[in-house]
Amino acid sequence: YIQLGRQEGGVVLTGGTAAEAPVDDVPSEGAFLRPTVIEGLSYTARTATEEIFGPVVTLHAFNSEQEAIDMANATQYGLAGSVWTADAERGHAFAQRMDTGIVWVNTWLNRDLRTPFGGVKQSGVGREGGAWSLNFFSELTNICVQQP
């Protein structure tokens, strides 16, 4: 995705290269990538709209709250999002307009395991967490028996 981001016109501000291991006593086996920040992409670019399960973020400027909502929702995915603001009430209202399974306001990865977690659109396959897990990890079978 980093190479694709460059091909799509993005500029890597930091990261984008392999990290040398071991780092902080992490074994040397494995793939390690430095956290990467990319700017200069269209908000419709693949690098900006696809789920990258790695330490990569894209930056996008906006001129209005509605433009920011449109950008956030202009993807076929919707696993999670975050809003950072000095006005928590406004952040909550903004989060309600986002098409994502979970939105963090002024925090990240803060979650009560008793609540459901999962994406919308093409993200995830349902909800896990709390009572929802029983359905998420179960397969129902309807059995009809004719009594003699």
Can you say where each PLM-predicted feature lies in the sequence?
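Conserved C-terminal structural/oligomerization subdomain of aldehyde/semialdehyde dehydrogenase
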Residues: 25-148
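Short, solvent-exposed loop/turn elements at beta->coil junctions and helix N-caps
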Residues: 16-25
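General beta-strand structural signal in soluble alpha/beta enzymes
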Residues: 12-15, 105-107
